[in-house]
Amino acid sequence: MEIRRRPPNPSVKVAHLQYAIPHADAEPRHILEKIVWEKDREVETARQRVPLETLKSQIADLPIPRDFIAALRQASRAPAVIAEVKKASPSQGVIRADFDPVLIANAYAEGGASCLSVLTDKSFFQGGFEVLVEVRQTVGLPLLCKDFILTPYQLYQARAAGADAALLIVAILSDQDLTYLSKVANSLGLNVLVEVHDAEELERVLNLGGFPLIGINNRDLTTFETDLETTETLSQQFATRLQQQGVLLVSESGLFNRADLDRVQAVGAEAVLVGEALMRQSDVCAGLQQLMIGDEGTSNS
């Protein structure tokens, strides 16, 4: 799947005024392309407001990032859970009206999450880097910056806000960009979670090599529909190569109960990323524990 980047608008000069002329075909074809185009604009604005050198100076004073991958491998209960701090999504709208990142992060930590994922996209998920900062100040768990990362600048933003890992979505990146952004992330001490959705994307990642943490997103980002068979199909199709490269496999999206966790764990997922199912719980801590323990928890209560 090819995701077009937002074309720059040509300009014409009339007298002393410069006008931008929108492209006739400058319309995104689906929601993912719309998000990417908006992200391009968002990053341009952020660069003007906070120069890269400012972010670098902020990072210089920060402690070394936590080891996101090690935290998943050392989880006391399998699969390890990456619990997500998410207020809204393009498909569901506002998921949690009483959104308090501090309370949610504390509940996740108490409930037994191995790591947290924090949405920093503002336009479509109502997140922000300020949310990541709040969560970082609240808990000691490793944090994933979950965003549509297209540029090195965003990785510096993530690191400055307290992230320990960053999401790189294969569908929106070329092989060259994926490799380069991964190197930049690693130079900042960030682990990388590389996200794929289909066989072509996973093939690309495995051919490049050097990605120890791969997430299979059960959600098609062009339609936002989910299907757990995505994890089952890809993990089995590429089982040998995943094992040969020592990949820690994460199943993302569409996971709502312990049976779902068992289903993806049975095909090799060592970790899961869960957001909506937990954000809809009135008691987030209890919801996380029930997700992790399932019937075992009710039988012992």
From Swiss-Prot:
Protein's UniProt keywords contain Amino-acid biosynthesis: yes
According to UniProt, the name of this protein is Indole-3-glycerol phosphate synthase
Q: Which residues form a coiled coil?
A: none
For this protein, the record's SUPFAM superfamilies field holds: Ribulose-phoshate binding barrel
Q: Which Pfam families match?
A: IGPS
For this chain's UniProt record, which GO biological process terms are given?
A: L-tryptophan biosynthetic process
Gene3D superfamilies in the cross-refs = Aldolase class I
Reaction(s) catalysed (UniProt annotation): 1-(2-carboxyphenylamino)-1-deoxy-D-ribulose 5-phosphate + H(+) = (1S,2R)-1-C-(indol-3-yl)glycerol 3-phosphate + CO2 + H2O
Which keywords appear in this protein's UniProt record, sorted alphabetically?
A: Amino-acid biosynthesis, Aromatic amino acid biosynthesis, Decarboxylase, Lyase, Tryptophan biosynthesis
Cite the InterPro entries for this sequence: Aldolase_TIM, Indole-3-glycerol_P_synth, Indole-3-glycerol_P_synth_dom, Indole-3-GlycerolPSynthase_CS, RibuloseP-bd_barrel
Copy the pathway line from the protein's UniProt record. Amino-acid biosynthesis; L-tryptophan biosynthesis; L-tryptophan from chorismate: step 4/5
- PROSITE patterns, per this entry? IGPS
PANTHER family per the record?
INDOLE-3-GLYCEROL-PHOSPHATE SYNTHASE, TRYPTOPHAN BIOSYNTHESIS PROTEIN
Family membership noted in the UniProt record: Belongs to the TrpC family.
Gene Ontology molecular function: indole-3-glycerol-phosphate synthase activity; phosphoribosylanthranilate isomerase activity
EC number(s) from the headed UniProt entry: 4.1.1.48
Reply yes or no: does the keyword Protease apply.
no
